[in-house]
């Protein structure tokens, strides 16, 4: 596969576009020549905007669909409905990015071509395409083959994919484990899984991002299980682990966006990571708390450093409402302004305001029906956050498509067969659309679903090109020099 190495022509690129100007200087990641699989890689410019290869700003507005992380070996819901039909509905509703939770365990299973521990939860009668014979009622395919079929369909539907390492071990409660390693799967196993995944899809820009680890968390009650953020090389230092993982991933594919989530707690002024969780005799709190994965206070003094690949960094907090947990900022009469002052700003919004890096809200969602939310407080929070993301073009993936998320519900119900139109109506204004209400894809070739347009359509197909006198000097070849 031919590539253009922009490191050799940084000056020419800067003359054409300001995409990688300023802080990135000559450390521009290699960009591929425009073609079906290499024209959609995304990068970050000096204004903390995510941009395409031409410097055009994009807005990642997607949703989550889980199943692979919990042991289903496939998206949940394929046990009843046709996978392609559901992916088509997601595209038609305008979600241009699919965040897919997986596990280190599953990726290593696929890497080693190990058999599925159980038959994937696929209805072979409604999914003949996912059977070995390709017929109704046939034998269900190997889970990795099914996954690659999903990738192909996403590509054709204009949906981009972000893989989320939701847990080390495949389990319905795997996200409850605070760190990226367990007794069964080490940090090295996590690295191995990430490297294999990156290498396998390095020539397919359907997969544009990796969320290195879902919701690192933990408190000082159990220090060894507490994800922390400092300048140490301690095994539970999330900052160090994330930088090491990102370095390995970007050495293989320097075009992937790297999503780094936050942690749960951070020491208050005058204290450090050796402080206890709380002094119960005086009721003194020694740490600032946050949602799991939502605390980026440590990034102010110790920001993530990806070296020459800094233009691939995106910080990815999670945020939920009072129906998940009655946090202190959900007091009576809360507003968008009060949440900003009491929680959002110091934990993650400052990163966007200071243009440190873009933000992608990796999870946000919840019930809005009268039965679950009788006083409307959860709906109020959702509206506050949605409006903030629209106003500031914060990227996001809504939690979730699934109906079987116990504390949030999903975009569908009735065994994945019916869309929750009220919830979708709340989310829809935060999906990337043009002035005519057409959904916008992150793909230059494929429109998003039946109701959208491609990225090239949105920008009228008028893309800047490199100066002709510089093209002759380009050195083309595989970006990793491994072919």
Predicted region positions:
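Sec-dependent N-terminal signal peptides
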Residues: 7-19
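N-terminal carbohydrate-binding accessory modules
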Residues: 28-99, 110-130, 137, 463-471
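Extracellular glycoside hydrolase catalytic/binding regions
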Residues: 79, 181, 191-208, 213-392
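Aromatic-lined substrate-binding rim segments of carbohydrate-active enzymes
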Residues: 75-172, 200, 237-254, 374-397
């Amino acid at each position: 596969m031919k590539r253009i190495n922009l490191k050799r022509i940084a000056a020419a690129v800067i003359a054409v576009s300001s995409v990688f100007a300023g802080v990135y200087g000559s450390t521009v990641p290699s960009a591929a020549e425009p073609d079906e699989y290499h024209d959609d890689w995304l990068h970050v410019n000096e204004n903390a905007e995510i941009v395409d290869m031409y410097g055009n700003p994009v807005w990642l507005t997607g949703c989550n669909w889980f199943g692979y992380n919990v042991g289903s070996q496939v998206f949940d819901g394929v046990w009843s409905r046709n996978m392609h039909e559901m992916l088509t509905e997601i595209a038609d509703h305008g979600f241009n990015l699919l965040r897919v939770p997986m596990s280190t365990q599953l990726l290593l299973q696929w890497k080693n071509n190990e058999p599925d521990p159980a038959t994937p939860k696929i209805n072979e009668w409604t999914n003949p395409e996912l059977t070995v014979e390709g017929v109704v009622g046939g034998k269900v395919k190997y889970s990795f083959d099914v996954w690659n079929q999903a990738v192909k369909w996403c590509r054709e539907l204009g949906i981009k994919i972000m893989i989320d390492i939701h847990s080390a071990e495949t389990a319905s409660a795997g996200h409850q484990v605070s760190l990226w390693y367990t007794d069964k799967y080490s940090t090295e196993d996590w690295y191995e899984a990430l490297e294999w995944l990156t290498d396998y899809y390095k020539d397919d820009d359907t997969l544009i991002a990796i969320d290195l680890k879902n919701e690192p968390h933990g408190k000082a009650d159990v220090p060894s299980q507490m994800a922390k953020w400092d300048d140490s090389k301690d095994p539970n230092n999330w900052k160090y682990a994330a930088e090491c993982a990102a370095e390995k991933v970007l050495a293989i594919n320097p075009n992937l966006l790297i999503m780094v989530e936050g942690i749960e707690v951070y020491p208050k002024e005058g204290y450090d990571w050796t402080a206890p969780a709380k002094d119960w005799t005086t009721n003194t709190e020694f740490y600032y708390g946050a949602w799991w994965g939502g605390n980026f206070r440590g990034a102010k003094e110790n920001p993530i450093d990806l070296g020459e690949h800094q233009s691939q960094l995106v910080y990815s907090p999670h945020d939920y409402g009072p129906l998940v947990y009655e946090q202190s900022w959900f007091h009576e009469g809360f507003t968008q302004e009060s949440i900003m002052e009491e929680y959002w700003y110091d934990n993650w919004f400052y990163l966007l305001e200071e243009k440190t890096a873009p933000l992608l809200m990796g999870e946000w969602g919840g019930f809005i029906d009268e039965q679950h939310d009788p006083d409307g407080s959860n709906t109020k929070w959702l509206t506050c956050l949605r409006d903030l993301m629209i106003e500031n073009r914060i990227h996001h993936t809504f939690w979730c498509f699934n109906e079987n998320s116990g504390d949030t519900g999903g975009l569908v119900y009735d065994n994945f067969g019916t869309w929750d139109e009220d919830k979708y109506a709340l989310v829809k204004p935060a999906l990337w659309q043009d002035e005519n209400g057409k959904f916008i894809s992150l793909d230059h070739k494929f429109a998003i679903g039946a109701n959208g347009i491609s990225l090239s359509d949105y920008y009228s197909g008028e893309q800047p090109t490199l100066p002709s006198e510089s093209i002759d000097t380009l050195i083309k070849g595989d970006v990793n020099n491994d072919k």
